[in-house]
Amino acid sequence: LGLTPATTILNRLSAADIAADPTLVATETGALTLAEGGALSSLGDSVLSGNLISAGGILLSNTYTGGNGAATDDRLTVTGTYLGENNGSGEGAWLALDTVLGDDDSATDRLVINGDATGTTSVRVNNAGGLGDKTLNGINLITVDGLAQDDTFL
């Protein structure tokens, strides 16, 4: 795993957590793999240059990471492909986001995938102060520029 000079990395081996801010580059294998029980936390605007294979947690939610309140300005961009792995017993890939539960234009954390997305990932949304409102298209939490199945993110 190679890192760019602009990368700040925190690796707590006992908890198997990686915090990326602002850039994490997967250069040797082209992929960052999160094992079950592992986590990638990304607060602010971060880029993973490469592919992401996850059987663990992707934490964009300040609530889950112990950050400062339920901020809705976190974004992780994966420049390659994404694979969410799930072992069928309810454990596996998951994504946590903070979102103001309101109309279509509500503030939210976002996951952006420039390539294809496959597999299954459960999505956990923390309400960041919204009172609820009607939506026409829904709140855009996840953008996949390539191909993805309807059940890739549940």
Give the positions of each predicted feature:
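Extracellular beta-solenoid/beta-roll
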Residues: 1-122, 126-127, 131-154
